[in-house]
């Protein structure tokens, strides 16, 4: 018994040393709180059957985890996510349309996630094609709450916002199923057209198996949709700059092959 106690006492300094070494390392792991909305396949709410979080979340996880960050995710609708970032409840939101106009509550990273080509979804056989705002006359358009197209087409966003067009604009609310609902509304002839990121349209069309009833038409809106991460101004400036720098450097170093691999994982490609 005396021998066992002696062994135990000899172990105490070793245990104390290990605790002293390990605790600082454990405390250095910072938690990054990430708010994001459902925009498959770029950002996705996971489930037991489908645990994947999407292209951009995979990208985000790779960049920040490699620098020792723990990522905590909050799956919320876009409008709520923006408020949570502005209020400091989340540190960042991984994708938001880039704009040169300052926005209250957050700042952009320098490096974009992607510059997306847009396209439209219509019922199969519909001869309509986008040819400027005038071509939308009489068409029922779907969009989501808080969605902003002004960075790719000021005219398109003005059309959606104009009270005179209210009877032709359907704002579709939801949690994680807004785009799915819009596709079904087009199929059911409740709305006529919907514009979005081409990759999103490809993914949802394939997942809902609606190729026989709907079609993606190109070209879409005038400019590419440039999206960037946004970071809360509630974060102390030094910490915020470090988070932004980590993203910018990680995104710049990501190879084209890596990008393509992330996209192929979700079965989408950039259409030339």
Residue positions per predicted region:
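Ligand-binding cleft/hinge of the Venus flytrap
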Residues: 60-67, 111, 147-176, 183-184, ...
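Periplasmic-binding protein-like
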Residues: 37-40, 115-119, 209-248, 269-272
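A ligand-binding cleft/hinge motif common to bilobed small-molecule-binding domains
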Residues: 80-86, 95-105, 155, 192-223
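Acidic, polar ligand-binding/catalytic clefts
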Residues: 73-135, 146-149, 219-220
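Extended ligand-binding regions for polar small-molecule ligands
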Residues: 57-66, 134-140, 145, 228-265
């Amino acid at each position: 018994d005396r021998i066992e106690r002696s062994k135990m006492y000899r172990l105490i300094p070793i245990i104390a040393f290990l605790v002293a070494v390990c605790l600082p390392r454990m405390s250095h792991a910072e938690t990054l709180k990430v708010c994001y909305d459902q925009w498959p396949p770029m950002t996705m709410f996971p489930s037991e059957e489908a645990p994947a979080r999407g292209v951009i979340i995979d990208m985000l996880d790779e960049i920040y985890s490699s620098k020792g960050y723990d990522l905590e995710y909050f799956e919320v609708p876009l409008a709520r996510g923006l408020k949570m970032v502005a209020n400091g409840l989340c540190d960042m939101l991984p994708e938001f349309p880039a704009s040169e106009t300052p926005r209250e509550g957050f700042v952009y990273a320098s490096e974009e996630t992607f510059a997306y080509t847009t396209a439209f979804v219509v019922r199969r056989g519909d001869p309509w094609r986008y040819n400027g705002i005038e071509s939308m006359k009489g068409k029922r358009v779907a969009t989501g709450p808080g969605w902003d197209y002004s960075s790719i087409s000021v005219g398109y966003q003005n059309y959606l916002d104009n009270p005179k067009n209210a009877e032709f604009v359907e704002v579709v609310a939801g949690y994680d199923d807004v785009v799915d609902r819009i596709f079904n509304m087009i199929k059911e002839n409740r709305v006529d057209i919907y514009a979005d990121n081409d990759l999103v349209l490809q993914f949802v069309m394939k997942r809902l198996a609606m190729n026989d009833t709907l079609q993606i038409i190109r070209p879409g809106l005038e400019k590419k949709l440039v999206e960037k991460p946004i970071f809360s101004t509630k974060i102390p400036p030094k910490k915020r700059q470090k988070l932004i720098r980590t993203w910018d450097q990680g995104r710049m170093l990501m190879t084209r092959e890596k990008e393509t691999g992330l996209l192929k994982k979700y079965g989408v490609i950039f259409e030339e």
